Design a protein with these regions (language model features):
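Conserved PLP-binding active-site segment in aminotransferase class I/II-type PLP enzymes
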Residues: 1-19, 28-31
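Conserved N-terminal alpha-helix of the aminotransferase class I/II PLP-enzyme fold
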Residues: 55, 62-95
């Protein structure tokens, strides 16, 4: 038994929780069990909770800014956890990574230019491209039996043929769970440098990389790679504080950083909220032991899910994630269309998952499930799915 209790089940309803309180408004039955959005059902580290409470008890919430300690805590985290020591001048703070992606698209591309992604991929990647009137250039990942790989030749061909100027990379990859190796990242980087394509690397899930795999920060590949990239990080997934709206973006190239900041200024954004600053600094300062225990718990949940689905729902294939607490389930052997499958899961299993089509056409045969929850909640969800599976006679 560890220091922290991850078996505790918290009632998150009536807290204005996006995950729990908005099913009906999003067209779902009121009684679905949510395993969709990527936030966890665990209370934040108690040490961090106390830091936030102390700040609330102060009672004044005027304009707040980060100081030297904020950056030093960040730097220590990345140095200790990833053997990467960023320079302070590289840091640009934003209220979220999706906001940062949108700012990058606007700062470094023109309307009509191509922005490259690898679907299936986190759906806001597509949104920030489409909403800013850029051309979405998709080079799908190559689906393997146990994991996906990158179509390097397809990427280079698309860059040349489609006038691509920006590449949005997801590492660790959401939803397929692949942690790109150093060799893969360098090969991607070499292609992009050759054709003067800027890489924006979303590394929000970097703290959830599982045994046998290592996360490599893109900017740590070497100086030439660092000069051609933007690295997006945040404490939100790691410590379950997405609602505090804080991200840390690292841009080693001075010219790129100035252009990025100018685009943020044009959008009218100026500074983080008070609790975001306090929460981010506090999380990276005191949250390490909590995270280490949490990762063990989630890895057990991942193994439980793999074993359970293989035993009771064998027509569904689970991809073992190398990173993230999200699992990618191949439902292509079920005799259902994607629409029929989604309706079956929602209305009969009473589960709210992220349907694979949200991640692009290449995800239509899949469902994504979030297993960052107490074991009993996970068991309840999988048992409900099993009953619906058996009722269908699969």
């Amino acid at each position: 038994m560890g220091q922290y209790n991850f078996d505790q089940i918290l009632d998150r309803t009536h807290t204005k929780s996006l995950k729990y309180d908005f099913a009906v408004k999003r067209g779902k039955p009121a009684d679905v069990l949510p395993f969709w959005v990527a936030d966890m059902d665990f209370e934040i580290p108690p040490e961090l909770k106390q830091i936030l409470l102390d700040r609330v008890n102060h009672g004044v919430f005027g304009y707040t800014e980060s100081d030297d300690e904020y950056f030093e805590v960040l730097q220590n985290w990345f140095s200790t956890r990833f053997n990467w020591t960023p320079d302070r001048k590289w840091l640009v703070k934003t209220p979220g990574i999706v906001f940062a992606l949108a700012m990058a698209v606007r700062a470094f591309t023109n309307e009509g230019e191509g922005v490259l992604i690898n679907q299936p991929v986190y759906y806001p990647f597509s949104m920030v491209i489409d909403d800013n009137d850029r051309r979405l250039i998709n080079v799908p990942l190559i689906k393997g039996e146990e994991m996906y790989t990158i179509d390097f030749e397809g990427i280079e061909r698309a860059i040349v043929e489609e006038n691509v100027t920006l590449f949005l990379l997801c590492n660790p990859h959401n939803p397929v769970g692949h942690v790109w190796t150093e060799d893969e990242l360098k090969r991607l980087g070499d292609i992009c440098i050759k054709h003067n394509v800027l890489i924006v690397s979303d590394e929000i899930h970097a703290d959830f990389v599982w045994k046998g795999h290592t996360h490599k920060v893109f900017a740590d590949l070497g100086e030439s790679y660092a000069e051609h990239c933007i690295v997006c990080t945040a404490p939100s997934k790691t410590f379950n504080i997405a609602g505090l709206q804080v991200s840390n973006i690292f841009i080693p190239n001075d010219s790129l950083r100035r252009r990025f900041i100018k685009e943020i200024d044009r959008a009218g954004y100026s500074q983080l909220n008070t609790m975001g600053i306090v929460g981010c600094e506090g999380a990276y300062k005191v949250g390490g032991p909590w995270l280490d225990e949490l990762k063990e718990y989630i890895q057990d949940n991942i193994q439980f899910t793999i074993d359970y689905v293989a035993k009771y729902m064998p027509k569904i294939h689970v991809y073992r994630p190398e990173g993230t607490y999200l699992m990618w389930l191949d439902c292509s052997k079920l005799p259902l269309t994607p629409k029929e499958r989604d309706e079956w899961i929602i209305n009969e299993a009473k589960l709210w998952l992220d349907t694979g089509s949200m991640f692009g056409v290449d995800g239509e045969d899949f469902e994504r499930i979030n297993v960052a929850c107490p074991r009993k909640v996970l068991e309840e969800g999988l048992e409900a799915w099993r009953r619906a599976y058996e009722t269908k006679g699969f």
